[in-house]
A protein has these predicted regions:
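Bacterial Sec-dependent N-terminal signal peptides
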Residues: 1-36
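Glycoside hydrolase catalytic-domain context in secreted enzymes
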Residues: 31-696, 700-721
């Protein structure tokens, strides 16, 4: 009996083994078949996305709604992080090309070059993505979906993150943001190179220290005429892949749970159908009770906040709210059909980037020398010549036996890179740029260079060598490189010192220690060229009156030093224009937390600023003439002649005043075109003005209406009044 029993057990075990092997084989076959199915590039994108969705479990679906998507190995879907940065080059992902910050890019008024630049950013991103995939690395910052551009309005010069934006004007911001989106989202053979995200929707521009609890209270007029136009323009003119909602509240409601903002306006009115993503951990501000950081506290629980966001149109959370999302689903606060709709959009986005193809698209290595050339070109075009007394610039090296280069930003390579940046292989500081240029000159024309930082940006005392005064006295010219630093202004910084708080500025003046140093040098009777590095406007009243030349060089990226030297010595004719107003210390600026637009920016200022929006000098002169309007084609024309002796670029700017709107802007930019004009030659610039500029906002009805009346147009020193 015992022997028979063993034999029967062996027989059963053998059958069981065969059954298990058979089941495993079937499962493996199904998995392989499923993987083959989702990797069929011939199927329509929508069909493939739906097929994958149908294979997912609920937990797998929910996992895709957090920015760190876990892998679904049984279907061959790799892990992926949606959080990647490319504000002015691929960021936080090792060595990469660092282009100028967005305020500097805006100063070029060259959206064509900005689009080319972001096309190169997409190329570099693909290169890095391909390498990460090969290495099995799926961390944050290694992907293709970029939380850029920042198209908030730089409404106040004190905002620390203003340097991430394209300035204070809605139309300039819209054009530059469009260039960024189209550059990143180049489409080849049906696949996007990368995906852009316009942020922060909406009405988001400080204060940084209070951003997790701040309520931006704005009128309908300010909302619709200043804060929303750039978003609307990009949604209407591009296929932008993502929109990010901001941390702040808008008129009492957190942006990421704001149905009026996200559903009524963005989705229903404008027809946006891309992905909605939260700012990182923004939903936590809705429910967390924090004794250290004040928060909105608008929802009782994390699940309630998740339901308010995902139960509406938010598809993806940058954060760690998966448990709350799951709880909201289990409580019946979010229907499964809505989860399916969100995940379907997420899958379509990944498929549109070619992420699930057997062979990754765009896997060839581009010519990276083009990236370096473009970084230099953009830095050169961004520099704004603010003052040039007695045409001291361009410098003639043979006139100077020795030149002193001093100031806290003279040899600071980190400053050049701004924030949200990559690590350049080599950043040329302004000191290095000047030294390098001088060393190319014949020995008999080569001035000696003396260098010292001389002072800090803000705090501390002078740390001068004993022979500092003698060295300056022996020099024929001083180049002072000062201004601000991303260590002082930026996103939610832990900075508390004179003139700075939490990443924002409390004063628009140049830090006192730098002005004191300039006054000390001025007393020595030396000509001074001041190179300002900053993310935005600085009040330079004393400097404008007392110094010989002023340049705004922004945070100019890895090639800033070379670009500044090229402008100082005349290799490049400066052509940048201010994307922000440079206020005088005499100008009134409303309280920082007031989001209404009266007295703000060139559009609503009635006082004279120190340097106006759109201002910038050149080493040549331009004459405007024959300003005309073709009523049939609705086009404006203007002739521009280079009357100087040097070739140069000019930015023709068209401004409009709506005389039917008593509360409207004093003037507003409605067109611009950057043109190259050789010495002595003339070009004709053509402007096509968007018809929406001819609509008047009616406060009584909280909407725009087309009302006939007079409109004043200006281009250079030319103007005309038209009845439309």
């Amino acid at each position: 009996m015992h022997i028979v029993s063993i034999g029967c057990n062996n027989e059963r075990m053998e059958k069981m083994k065969k059954l298990i092997i058979s089941i495993v084989g079937i499962v493996l076959t199904c998995c392989v078949t499923a993987q083959q199915d989702i990797r069929k590039p011939g199927l329509p994108l929508e069909e493939r996305a739906q097929m994958i969705l149908d294979m997912l479990t609920l937990d797998e679906k929910l996992g895709m709604m957090e920015h760190r998507n876990p892998a679904v190995e049984r279907l061959g879907i790799p892990a992926y992080s949606w959080w990647n940065e490319a504000l002015h080059g691929v960021a936080r992902n090792g060595f990469a090309t660092v282009y100028p910050m967005p305020t500097a890019l805006a100063a070029t008024f060259d959206d064509k070059s900005v689009q080319e630049m972001f096309g190169m950013v997409a190329d570099e991103a693909r290169m890095k993505y391909f390498r990460s995939q090969r290495a099995g690395q799926y961390d944050d910052y290694a992907g293709l979906t970029f939380f850029t551009p920042n198209i908030n309005i730089f409404r106040d010069p004190r905002w620390g993150r203003g340097m991430e934006t394209y300035g204070e004007d809605p139309y300039l911001t819209a054009r530059m943001g469009t260039a960024c989106v189209n550059g990143l989202q180049q489409q080849v053979n049906g696949y996007y190179k990368a995906m852009a995200c316009i942020k922060h929707f909406a009405v988001h521009s400080g204060p940084e220290a209070d951003r997790h609890s701040f309520d931006a209270v704005v009128s309908g007029r300010a909302l619709w005429t200043t804060y929303l136009p750039a978003f609307k323009y990009i949604v209407k003119h591009t296929d932008v892949g993502m929109v990010m909602c901001g941390y702040n509240r808008l008129n009492g409601v957190p942006c990421c749970t704001n149905e009026h903002l996200l559903v009524d306006i963005l989705q229903n009115l404008w027809g946006y159908n891309g992905l909605f993503v939260t700012d990182c951990w923004a939903l936590n501000d809705c429910w967390e009770r924090d004794t250290v950081i004040p928060r909105h506290e608008t929802h009782a629980t994390a699940a309630a906040a998740a339901a308010a966001a995902f139960g509406s149109v938010v598809d993806l959370e940058c954060g760690s709210g998966l448990p709350a999302l799951k709880e909201a689903v289990e409580q019946g606060l979010i229907p499964i059909s809505m989860i399916d709709a969100h995940v379907l959009k997420i899958l379509k986005a990944r498929l549109s980037l070619g992420m699930l193809e057997p062979e990754q698209p765009f896997n060839t290595i581009p010519d990276t020398t083009l990236f370096e050339k473009k970084a230099l070109e953009m830095a050169q075009k961004s520099i704004v010549l603010l003052q040039n007394k007695d045409n001291i610039l361009p410098l003639q090296p043979e006139k100077y036996k020795s030149i002193a280069i001093i100031g806290p930003n003279a040899a600071d390579s980190a400053m050049l890179c701004g924030n949200y940046n990559g690590t350049p292989y080599h950043a040329v500081t302004l000191y290095e740029g000047v030294l390098k240029y001088v060393n190319t000159l014949p020995e008999n024309q080569r001035p000696q260079i003396y260098f010292d930082t001389a002072c800090h940006h803000v705090d501390g005392h002078y740390r001068l060598p004993r022979d500092f005064d003698k060295q300056i006295a022996d020099c024929d010219l001083v180049i002072f490189v000062g201004g601000l630093s991303p260590e002082l202004e930026g996103e939610e910084l832990k900075v508390e010192m004179e003139g700075f708080h939490g990443g924002d500025r409390t004063s628009i003046n140049l830090p006192r220690i730098q002005e004191d140093m300039l006054k000390r040098i001025k007393k020595m009777g030396k000509p001074i060229v001041f190179v300002l590095c900053s993310g935005g406007a600085v009040a330079l009243d004393w400097e404008d009156e007392n110094l010989d030349a002023l340049l705004a060089a922004w945070y100019g990226g890895q090639a800033a030093g070379t670009a500044v030297a090229d402008v100082l010595f005349g290799k490049i004719n400066p052509s940048g224009k201010l994307p922000v107003t440079f206020y005088s210390t005499k100008n009134y600026i409303p309280p920082f937390d007031n989001y209404e637009m009266e007295h703000r920016t060139y559009r609503f200022m009635t006082e004279e600023p120190l340097y106006p929006f759109g201002y910038g000098l050149s080493y040549t002169d331009f004459r405007y003439s024959d300003f005309s309007f073709d009523a049939g084609q609705q086009l404006f024309y203007c002739r521009i002649t280079n009357t100087g002796k040097r070739d140069g670029d000019e930015v023709a700017q068209l401004y409009m005043t709506n005389k039917n709107d008593d509360r409207g802007p004093v003037k507003t930019l409605v067109g611009f075109e950057r043109v190259h004009i050789p010495a002595g030659e003339t070009v004709v610039v053509t402007f096509a003005v968007d018809s929406e500029f001819f609509h008047t906002y009616i406060d009584e009805y909280q909407r725009f209406e087309k009302r006939s009346g007079f409109f004043l147009f200006r281009c250079g020193d030319q103007e005309m009044e038209i009845y439309l």
